[in-house]
Regions:
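Membrane-embedded catalytic cores of phosphoryl/pyrophosphoryl-handling enzymes
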Residues: 49-50, 94-200
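Hydrophobic alpha-helical transmembrane segments in multi-pass membrane proteins
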Residues: 43-44, 75-79, 111
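Membrane-helix interfacial "entry" motifs
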Residues: 25-32, 55, 59, 63, ...
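Membrane-helix interface segments
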Residues: 26-27, 59-64, 91, 128-133
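Alpha-helical transmembrane segments of multi-pass membrane proteins, especially transporters
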Residues: 17, 66-71, 137, 160-164
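N-terminal transmembrane-helix/juxtamembrane module of multi-pass inner/ER membrane proteins
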Residues: 1-42, 83-95, 199-200
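Interfacial segments of alpha-helical transmembrane regions
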Residues: 47-74
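Small-polar-interrupted transmembrane alpha-helices in polytopic inner-membrane proteins
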Residues: 68-87, 134-147
Length: 200
């Protein structure tokens, strides 16, 4: 069990109770839509779309493998941690259906890892400012999903913080492993054009 009472954990009960107590049908609907962004089904569709588009454009399977390793790996890692910790969910009204152990948050982990992986792939040929914007959007998605899980009463605050950390950690590990392969990728047509012009 993960204890509560000091540091960040001291906010666990307060956040869970505040979210449940102040919920409205409108806020619950909005938070439910946000939390869907961290669902495995939604992320699998997003990863498949981005991977397919990138494969058609760049013709290199390394990015496809990277994206699926990030998603599958973070889900397996997080489920393993859930099994080890086996923490109960907050004893408040759950505003959406849920099951299984609470720590760490699977939606938070999956959103954190996969949103950054997609941003890295989509924006790798963009300008520095464009890549920064993509990273900012990915971070916003991760934080929004994490907040939604806590405010919907299905996770403690420490669950979503830990889940986000797991997700970002798995993304960084995957990016390091695939880093050389990803950096060598580029638009084949653009590379051919540069070669004809005699530019590197």
């Amino acid at each position: 069990m993960v204890g509560r009472g000091s540091g960040l954990a001291a906010w666990d009960e307060a956040v869970a109770e505040w979210g449940s107590r102040n919920a409205t049908s409108w806020s619950t609907s909005v938070l439910d839509r946000v939390t869907d962004l961290g669902g495995t089904g939604y992320l699998a569709v997003a990863v498949t779309f981005v991977a397919s588009y990138d494969l058609i454009r760049h013709r290199n399977p390394n990015v496809v493998l990277f994206l699926f390793v990030v998603l599958a790996g973070v889900v397996l890692t997080n489920n393993g941690l859930k099994w080890l910790v086996d923490r109960e969910r907050p004893p408040v009204r759950h505003l959406v259906a849920t099951s299984g152990s609470s720590f760490p948050s699977g939606h938070s982990a999956a959103a954190a890892a996969t949103s950054f992986a997609i941003a890295l792939v989509v924006a790798r040929d963009w300008s520095r400012r464009g890549r920064a914007v993509a990273a900012g959007v990915a971070a916003l998605i991760a934080v929004a999903v994490a907040a939604s899980r806590a405010l919907l009463g299905v996770h403690w605050l420490t669950d979503v913080v830990a889940g986000t950390a797991v997700g970002w950690g798995w993304f960084l590990l995957s990016a390091l492993v695939f880093g050389g392969r990803l950096q060598r990728l580029g638009d084949p047509a653009a590379r051919a054009g540069a070669a004809r012009r005699g530019t590197p």
